[in-house]
Amino acid sequence: MSFASEMKNELTRIDVEEMNAKAELSALIRMNGALSLSNQQFVINVQTENATTARRIYSLIKRVFNVEVEILVRKKMKLKKNNIYICRTKMKAKEILDELGILKDGIFTHEIDHSMIQDDEMRRSYLRGAFLAGGSVNNPETSSYHLEIFSQNESHAEGLTKLMNSYELNAKHLERKKGSITYLKEAEKISDFLSLIGGYQALLKFEDVRIVRDMRNSVNRLVNCETANLNKTVSAAMKQVESIKLIDKEIGIENLPDRLREIARIRVEHQEISLKELGEMVSTGPISKSGVNHRLRKLNDLADKIRNGEQIEL
């Protein structure tokens, strides 16, 4: 089972009070529902590919409106072989849509009805219903952080974005070919959203994976940094040894001033050690990294003068 499916399975087991059930149902029917006319009777069909979501829709409609609901199962055509579950009710169709703020004066509305998001719990419930209806979230173990909710109507996506941002989630929306999506990209905001809609088990799993990923990334960055520093140290040491050998060949190390002669010999004998370690091996007492670096720079400058055929003064 995918991370998104596990999360939806958890969300469908949450107990809610009647007004919160209405808010959740309002999102589910608005986003996945359709109204049709059969035998001069209005029929509501709510469609989903998730079996637990279908059971949730079934139980919420029966509980809130006390009407008969049937679940139909269809096989999806084309490449995907998922089942399609249709929750159908032929009773009180217009009354249900009107009470859920989906139908107003006989006209379908695309905006989120204010009566469905009157308080904090109802807003959370509406967002939970929206995620159950059109939500998906990447597996945090294998993918980049991404959570989105698909809406067929752009104005509903805008309303959903605004509702999510009332909780400072930094949600954004954009148009897609067959609708619009409201999405989150930041791991911290996805965690906040999971908590907001009651997905606490999903939140714990998400945070566990996030911590491991962050630690792994930190270690990788540290290793890369150490590797880069080591490469720089090795390159610098090779250049220094090359310069010292050139000086020895052309002038002779024994002809260098004492301070340069000693550091030159230590560097040639210990090509792998750091500047700090070089400084600790000086016979007159430890000298700082900057002191060692200053002497080695003088040796490099001297070698450059030899290469350029310049006059040398020791």
Curated annotation (Swiss-Prot):
Tagged with keyword ATP-binding: no
Q: Which Gene3D superfamilies match?
A: Homing endonucleases
Going by the UniProt record, its keywords in alphabetical order are: Cell cycle, Cell division, DNA-binding
Record-linked SUPFAM superfamilies: Homing endonucleases
DNA-binding annotation, residue ranges on this chain: 274-308
Please provide the Gene Ontology terms (biological process) for this protein.
cell division; regulation of sporulation
InterPro entries membership: Homing_endonucl, Sporu_reg_WhiA_N_dom, Sporulation_regulator_WhiA, Sporulation_regulator_WhiA_C, WhiA_LAGLIDADG_dom
Keyword hit for Translocase:
no
Annotated coiled-coil segments of the chain: none
The superkingdom listed in its UniProt entry is: Bacteria
One of the entry's Gene Ontology molecular-function terms is: DNA binding
* Stored NCBIfam families: DNA_bind_WhiA
What family does the Swiss-Prot or TrEMBL record give for this protein?
Answer: Belongs to the WhiA family.
Free-text function comment from the UniProt entry? Involved in cell division and chromosome segregation.
Protein name, per record? Probable cell division protein WhiA
Q: Which organism is it from?
A: Staphylococcus aureus (strain USA300)
